[in-house]
C-alpha cells in the first residue's frame, strides 16, 4: 500500500497585479497534489464604484461576523447612497477571516467541499455587495444642483426624474419665482404638478402679459383651467385699463350679448386683437370655438337711393377660411404643400414628347410621286 497524502508545506506569496491578491501554496508529499490557491484580503476604502451602480469589496462575510465589516470599506459619503444586499456565496480561510478564496482552475466549491477536514479550515459565507439606492440629499447646494440640472452626474433618481415626483417642488417653487422663463421651470410646469401650476398662477396674476404665461395657459387647459382663470381674474381686476382685459372684464351691459350673441363672437377685443387665449376665460375660449362669425370689408364708391331703398352686396360668403377657432388646447396643424414628384414630371415630359413627335410627322407636306404601271406577262 502507498503512503497517505500529507500536507508538508504552506507558503503565502503576494500577488503581482493587485496587492490585495495573495497565493497560498500547498505542498504535499506527492507533487501531483500541489496546489496554489488564490485569495484576497481587502484593504481598500472605496470611494468609487466597482461597476455601474454597485460596490463589491473583496471580503467574504462568514457566519458570526458583523455586517459592519462590510460597511467599513466604503467612505461615509457612499454609505448614504448604497445598501448592503445578499452577495454571492464565497469561501474564506478561518485562520484569515474575511479572506476571499477565488474559484478558478481545479479550485471550485465542489473541490473544497470534498476535501477531508476542509470545514476545519475553510468557512462559507457571502461576499459584501452594495447597490446604489435613491436617497435624500441633505444639503441645499446638492438639491439646487440636481433640481436645476446644473450638475446631475451624482444625483439620485428621485432628484433627477424630470420632476415626476415631489422632491424638487420646494426648490423649484422659489427658483421659478425668480426666473419663471427658465426652460427647467417650464419643464417642471409641463409635468403638471399642482405646486408648479399654483406657482405660475400666482406669477401670472401679476405678469399675465409675459410670454411664459401663454405657455402656462396652454398647459393647464382643459384639465386644470381654474389656475389660469384665477390668474386672469386677479390680473384684470388690478389692471382694468389694460385693453387685453376688455374681453374678460367687459363693462356690465347685456344689450350686446342679448341681441348679438356672446361677445367673444363679435367684440373687437375678443375676435381680432386678443388672439392669445390667455386673455379669455376658459368658458369664453370654448365658446369662441363655436362662433359662426365672418369678417369682411365693404367699399362703397357711390350710393343711389330710390324710394328710400338701398341695396348693398358684399363678398363675405366667398371666404374659404374655416369658420370659428380650433378647440382650445389643440395645436393648429398647417397642411403641407404637396410638391410634384420627379416621377410625375418625367412621365409628363415623355407624354408631351410623344405628342409633339406625332404632330411633327403628320404635319410634314406629302412627297409627290409618279405612278408606275406594272404588267404581268
Curated annotation (Swiss-Prot):
Where does the protein principally reside?
virion
GO BP of this protein: DNA-templated transcription termination; membrane fusion involved in viral entry into host cell; symbiont entry into host cell
Q: What keywords would UniProt list here?
A: ATP-binding, Disulfide bond, DNA-binding, Fusion of virus membrane with host membrane, Helicase, Hydrolase, Late protein, Lipoprotein, Membrane, Myristate, Nucleotide-binding, Phosphoprotein, Signal-anchor, Transcription, Transcription regulation, Transcription termination, Transmembrane, Transmembrane helix, Viral envelope protein, Viral penetration into host cytoplasm, Virion, Virus entry into host cell
Q: Name one GO molecular function term.
A: DNA binding
Question: Which InterPro entries does this entry report, sorted A to Z?
Answer: Pox_virus_G9/A16
The residue ranges for the Virion surface side of the membrane come to 2-342
Task: Describe what upregulates or represses it.
Answer: Expressed in the late phase of the viral replicative cycle.
Can you say where in the cell this protein is located? Answer: Virion membrane
Give the lipid-moiety residues, type N-myristoyl glycine: 2
**Transmembrane regions listed in the UniProt entry:** 343-363
What's the PTM story here?
Most cysteines are linked by disulfide bonds. They are created by the viral disulfide bond formation pathway, a poxvirus-specific redox pathway that operates on the cytoplasmic side of the MV membranes.
Q: Which residues lie on this side of the membrane: Intravirion?
A: 364-377
What Gene Ontology terms describe where this protein resides (cellular component)? membrane; viral envelope; virion membrane
What's its membrane topology?
Single-pass type II membrane protein
Similarity remark: Belongs to the orthopoxvirus OPG143 family.
State whether it acts alone or in a complex, and with which partners, per the record: Part of a stable entry-fusion complex (EFC) which is at least composed of proteins OPG143, OPG147, OPG155, OPG086, OPG094, OPG107, OPG104, and OPG099. Formation of the viral membrane is necessary for the assembly of the complex. Interacts with OPG094. Interacts with OPG153.
Q: What does this protein do?
A: Envelope protein part of the entry-fusion complex responsible for the virus membrane fusion with host cell membrane during virus entry. Also plays a role in cell-cell fusion (syncytium formation).
- Name under which the protein is recorded: Virion membrane protein OPG143
- Lineage, opening ranks: Viruses, Varidnaviria, Bamfordvirae, Nucleocytoviricota, Pokkesviricetes
- Gene from which this protein is expressed: OPG143
Amino acid at each position: 500500500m502507498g503512503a497517505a497524502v500529507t500536507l508538508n508545506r504552506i507558503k503565502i506569496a503576494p500577488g503581482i497585479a493587485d496587492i490585495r491578491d495573495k497565493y497560498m501554496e500547498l505542498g504535499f508529499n506527492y507533487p501531483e497534489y500541489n496546489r496554489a490557491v488564490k485569495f484576497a484580503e481587502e484593504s481598500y476604502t472605496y470611494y468609487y464604484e466597482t461597476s455601474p451602480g454597485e460596490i463589491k469589496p473583496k471580503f467574504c462575510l462568514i457566519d458570526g461576523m458583523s455586517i459592519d465589516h462590510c460597511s467599513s470599506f466604503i467612505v461615509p459619503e457612499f454609505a448614504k447612497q448604497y445598501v448592503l444586499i445578499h452577495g454571492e456565496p464565497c469561501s474564506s480561510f478561518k485562520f484569515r477571516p474575511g479572506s476571499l478564496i477565488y474559484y478558478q482552475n481545479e479550485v471550485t466549491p465542489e473541490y473544497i467541499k470534498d476535501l477531508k477536514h476542509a470545514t476545519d479550515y475553510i468557512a462559507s459565507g457571502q461576499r459584501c455587495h452594495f447597490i446604489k439606492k435613491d436617497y435624500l440629499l441633505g444639503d441645499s447646494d446638492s438639491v439646487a444642483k440636481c433640481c436645476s440640472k446644473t450638475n446631475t452626474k451624482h444625483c439620485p433618481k428621485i432628484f433627477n426624474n424630470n420632476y415626476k415626483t415631489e422632491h424638487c417642488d420646494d426648490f423649484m417653487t422659489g427658483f421659478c419665482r425668480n426666473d419663471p422663463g427658465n426652460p427647467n421651470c417650464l419643464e417642471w410646469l409641463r409635468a403638471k404638478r399642482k405646486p408648479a401650476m399654483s406657482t405660475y398662477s400666482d406669477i401670472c396674476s401679476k405678469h399675465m402679459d409675459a410670454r411664459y404665461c401663454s405657455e402656462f395657459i396652454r398647459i393647464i387647459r382643459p384639465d386644470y383651467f381654474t389656475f389660469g382663470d384665477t390668474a386672469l381674474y386677479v390680473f384684470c381686476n388690478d389692471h382694468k385699463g389694460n385693453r387685453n382685459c376688455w374681453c374678460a372684464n367687459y363693462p356690465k351691459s347685456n344689450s350686446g350679448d342679448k341681441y348679438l350673441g356672446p361677445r367673444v363672437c363679435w367684440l373687437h377685443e375678443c375676435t381680432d386683437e386678443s388672439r392669445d387665449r390667455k386673455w379669455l376665460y376658459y368658458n369664453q375660449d370654448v365658446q369662441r370655438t363655436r362662433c359662426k362669425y365672418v369678417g369682411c370689408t365693404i367699399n362703397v364708391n357711390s350710393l343711389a337711393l330710390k324710394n328710400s331703398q338701398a341695396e348693398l352686396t358684399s363678398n363675405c360668403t366667398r371666404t374659404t377660411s374655416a369658420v370659428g377657432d380650433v378647440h382650445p388646447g389643440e395645436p393648429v396643424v398647417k397642411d403641407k404643400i404637396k410638391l410634384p414628384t420627379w416621377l410625375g414630371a418625367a412621365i409628363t415630359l415623355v407624354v408631351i414628347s410623344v405628342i409633339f413627335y406625332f404632330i411633327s410627322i403628320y404635319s410634314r407636306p406629302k412627297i409627290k410621286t409618279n405612278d408606275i404601271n406594272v404588267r404581268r406577262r
